């Protein structure tokens, strides 16, 4: 396992803990599909730590009362196409 996989594992574990314990208490609040936590999880699973962190921060900043929300997938890796499997996610873990 590379050092970057280990580094990416830290936010992945934190996001999963948030989704398991905190998100159910807060209720659905994300305007986007996938939800912000799903987006962040996918970003860290797909991209390097720094790019995933940037994508996650930028997404959270855009998830505000003034945004319309909607479908906003994680960008694919360079040279690949976006999978449609995450588009149909109906989870409301924000």
UniProtKB/Swiss-Prot annotation:
Instruction: Name the keywords, alphabetized.
Output: Cell inner membrane, Cell membrane, Membrane
Q: Spell out the residue ranges making up region: Disordered.
A: 72-94
Membrane topology, from the record: Peripheral membrane protein
What broad class describes the main subcellular location of this protein?
membrane
Q: What is one GO cellular-component annotation here?
A: plasma membrane
Respond yes or no to whether keyword DNA-binding is given for this record: no
Q: Where in the cell is it found?
A: Cell inner membrane
Q: What is this protein's function per UniProt? A: Could be involved in insertion of integral membrane proteins into the membrane.
Q: Which family does it belong to?
A: Belongs to the UPF0161 family.
The identity of this protein, by name, is: Putative membrane protein insertion efficiency factor
């Amino acid at each position: 396992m590379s050092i970057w996989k280990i580094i990416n594992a830290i936010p992945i574990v934190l996001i999963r803990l948030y989704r398991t314990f905190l998100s159910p208490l807060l209720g659905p609040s994300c305007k986007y599909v996938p939800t912000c936590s799903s987006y962040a999880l996918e970003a860290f699973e797909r991209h390097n730590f720094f790019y995933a962190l940037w994508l996650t921060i930028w997404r959270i900043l855009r998830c505000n009362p003034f945004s319309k929300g909607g479908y906003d997938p994680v960008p694919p890796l360079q040279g690949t196409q976006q999978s449609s499997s995450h588009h149909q996610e109906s989870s409301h873990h924000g």
